[in-house]
Amino acid sequence: MAKKVAAQIKLQLPAGKATPAPPVGPALGQHGVNIMEFCKRFNAETADKAGMILPVVITVYEDKSFTFIIKTPPASFLLKKAAGIEKGSSEPKRKIVGKVTRKQIEEIAKTKMPDLNANSLEAAMKIIEGTAKSMGIEVVD
């Protein structure tokens, strides 16, 4: 018989740097998960992706065991890295804070493809372009 799911927790953590301090500790602690075990397993799996922010979905079962799925970095994080900026525009569509090329958009779309709700690379690129536009990043050819 399959284990019963008690909770599903979604967090965004820096790769290889999960610690029992907030936000990880309180989020997992209230569901009775062994926080240190999660931190060790997460850090071991993400050690090669240092410097990235990774969304993780943790499924906690009634017997306090857990599994987790690591997703691809957020599109906004990848766009900021590609454009070489710290943060998006405070006034998107009015203030342009950076530029990315179609080639960079294509690379980001390929990276994000498993997590995007898109059937083709073109559709994925449109999603990423929309994110760029809403962050005040201009897409140039």
Swiss-Prot record:
Quaternary structure annotation from Swiss-Prot or TrEMBL: Part of the ribosomal stalk of the 50S ribosomal subunit. Interacts with L10 and the large rRNA to form the base of the stalk. L10 forms an elongated spine to which 3 L12 dimers bind in a sequential fashion forming a heptameric L10(L12)2(L12)2(L12)2 complex.
Known role: Forms part of the ribosomal stalk which helps the ribosome interact with GTP-bound translation factors.
PTM characteristics: One or more lysine residues are methylated.
Keyword Cell division appears in the UniProt entry: no
The protein, known as: Large ribosomal subunit protein uL11
Organism (species): Thermotoga maritima (strain ATCC 43589 / DSM 3109 / JCM 10099 / NBRC 100826 / MSB8)
GO biological process: translation
Similarity comment text for this entry: Belongs to the universal ribosomal protein uL11 family.
Any one Gene Ontology cellular component term annotated for this protein: cytosolic large ribosomal subunit
Keywords: Methylation, Ribonucleoprotein, Ribosomal protein, RNA-binding, rRNA-binding
GO function terms (MF aspect): large ribosomal subunit rRNA binding; structural constituent of ribosome
Organism lineage: Bacteria, Thermotogati, Thermotogota, Thermotogae, Thermotogales
NCBIfam families in the cross-refs: L11_bact
SMART domains the record matches: RL11 (SM00649)
InterPro entries found in the cross-reference section: Ribosomal_uL11, Ribosomal_uL11_bac-typ, Ribosomal_uL11_C, Ribosomal_uL11_C_sf, Ribosomal_uL11_CS, Ribosomal_uL11_N, Ribosomal_uL11_N_sf
Keyword Transit peptide applies: no
